[in-house]
Amino acid sequence: MPMSARSRRSNPRLPPSPSSSSSSDAVRASPHSSPPSRLRPPSANPDVSSNILLFLIGFRLVNALTVRTFFQPDEFFQSLEPAWKIAFGTNQGPWITWEWEHQLRSSLHPLIFAAVYTVADLVARTLGLTPTSRAELLIAGPGITQAVIAAVGDFYTWKLARYIYGDRSHESWATVRIRSNAIEADADQLQLALTVVSLASVALYRSAWGERQTLAREALICGSSVLAVSTVVDRFFYGFWTFPPLRFLYFNVAQSLAAFYGRNDWSYYASQGYPLLLTTALPFTLVGLYRTLKTPPKLEKQKGSILVQLASISLAMPATLSVITHKEVRFIYPLLPALHILSASPLVEFFIPALTTTNREYISRRLTLIFLLWANVAIAIYTTLFHASGVISVLSYIREQHQIHGTANIPSLPKESPASYGGITTGFLMPCHSTPWRSHLVEPTIHAWALSCEPPVGLTAEEKAAYRDEADQFYDNPTQFLQDNMVGGLRHIPRRPSYATPPSSQRQPTQLFPPHEWPDYLVFFAQLEPTLKDALRGSSYGECWRTFNSAWHDDSRRRGDVVVWCLDHAKQQAWQSQKHQRELEDRDRQFDHIIKRFQRDATPSKSWHWSHWTSPFSSQSKSWSWPWERKKRTLFGYELPDLPQWGWFGKRKKKTLLSDFWF
């Protein structure tokens, strides 16, 4: 927080405080100045804000380009799939979910990524990029755009914290945290709004009546303009006038369709939501909430009121959402910036003494800080690169196979009927929305289908109670489902892939709804592998690819590796040869490791230790022995008994030959 003018005049050697936002300048210009707080060292760069923004953009770009995992289906099916439809047309294979068919979503969000797709496709055509490079550009484009939005959200979160705690306080630097997962755009837009709404509340509190009227008028004009633009855009997207927020409330509250996707306990957000959202910051957030609501913050009145507003919203929003039976952590994700601001002050108070002094009293706090940092880094790395990575990698494999066997070498396909061209077929026997769709498949000639999970729209209460979607029917009895819902059942499975079949005998697969055609590639989780081996024994399907997906999963149907079976015997043999070669390499590395252990144990150590000490009254056998054989000690030719193992000297673990075979 800024120091008072009197204290600055009494010490002329203090540097002037750096400039901040216009709202902060207005508050500092008032005669009421905040009390001194812990100050950061003066910055040598006068334009700190621009440097911070550039750093956040760079960090977010690296974050976006290194993400290799799957977070939530909505980051693809509620944004990128509708955007693909806007940019390339319906016949290019986007999966449009039921929410869009019933006008439950606004098209403003997908419109951003539709523009990105259009620009990326134009760049690819202008530069003459290969299909592989074009696909990578189309996949990376939305992530780069979202990274910039997230960076701006982080920047304005920092600006709000700087306004509350002061330009040079530690708290303003403790609020921006790493978020490894993909973020919905409306969450970041709310981060931007947090600053505007909070500063507007301060202006409303301090201003005269005329200025309040001006602020209210501008808020009304801006809100009405956004609502009008959203309504017009939805009119062009859906083809008729509609109001998605009202229909969203009707379907999810009046018809209770949200409960179809799961019911949660009333305390979900308190017992699971906040812990999953905040992880290691949870204790500091709880302290910040308690202090803010229990005792008045030691800040200026206006700044303290902002913290009270943030704390109230952070409690009121989960309480309101708890009324709805279906709950998810991402519903309270927009609260994360506010929660970080509230946790900043307790975090600084706890760790700053341990970092600014060398007192041994704070060793435990230093160790705690190191643990929290490493815990966050470990979580970020695992969730960004490993957990649920197989469902992304498998689509890269499918695209590679399409490059080999499909028609990706065609420079451009007409949007009217891409299905008339050849390609490869893929079926996903997974819970619905387990993988991204056309945003990662890219090529329209990759003909794919997957199990659906449409809710019971328009059914009676009795019909809703007995309703089972397609994915549920499959997992209830996989063998019977394949018999009843696949073309030809289990007795007429193709022997050859479609790309090796003459065009006259090819049949175009039906997307998304049964009956499904038997595809060239079957994709499923390893949990289902024993069932499919039994159901498809004797068929031409065999394993041709496998990759790690997750070490654990809360959904038992999604556990294990992602496995791909295919009809191409050459690919099956190549994969088996590759697996055998990998096993040989692993065995050779293990054997080399054992040999090195033998050589190291057989070579006498040059370092002196107690085991090499020999009493003048004893003699060791000089004959050669195996490295793992226990050495004997004798006295005048008689073997001495082993010394007892005293507990206070510590029990030394003896190495055996068996231990050499383990890493």
Curated annotation (Swiss-Prot):
Its EC number is 2.4.1.-. One of its GO terms (biological process) is GPI anchor biosynthetic process. Residues 1-44, 492-512 are annotated as: Disordered. GO terms for cellular component: endoplasmic reticulum membrane. It comes from the Eukaryota. Pathway: Glycolipid biosynthesis; glycosylphosphatidylinositol-anchor biosynthesis. InterPro entries: GPI_mannosylTrfase (IPR005599). It is a multi-pass membrane protein. Keywords: Endoplasmic reticulum, Glycosyltransferase, GPI-anchor biosynthesis, Membrane, Transferase, Transmembrane, Transmembrane helix. The chain crosses the membrane at residues 47-67, 110-130, 137-157, 226-246, 269-289, 304-324, 335-355, 367-387. It is an enzyme of class 2 (transferase). It is found in: Endoplasmic reticulum membrane. The keyword Transmembrane helix applies. One of its GO terms (molecular function) is alpha-1,2-mannosyltransferase activity. Residues 501-511 have a biased composition (Polar residues). Residues 1-11 have a biased composition (Basic residues). The keyword Endoplasmic reticulum applies. Residues 19-42 have a biased composition (Low complexity). PANTHER family: GLYCOSYLTRANSFERASE, GPI MANNOSYLTRANSFERASE 3. Mannosyltransferase involved in glycosylphosphatidylinositol-anchor biosynthesis. Transfers the third mannose to Man2-GlcN-acyl-PI during GPI precursor assembly. Belongs to the glycosyltransferase 22 family. PIGB subfamily. This is GPI mannosyltransferase 3.
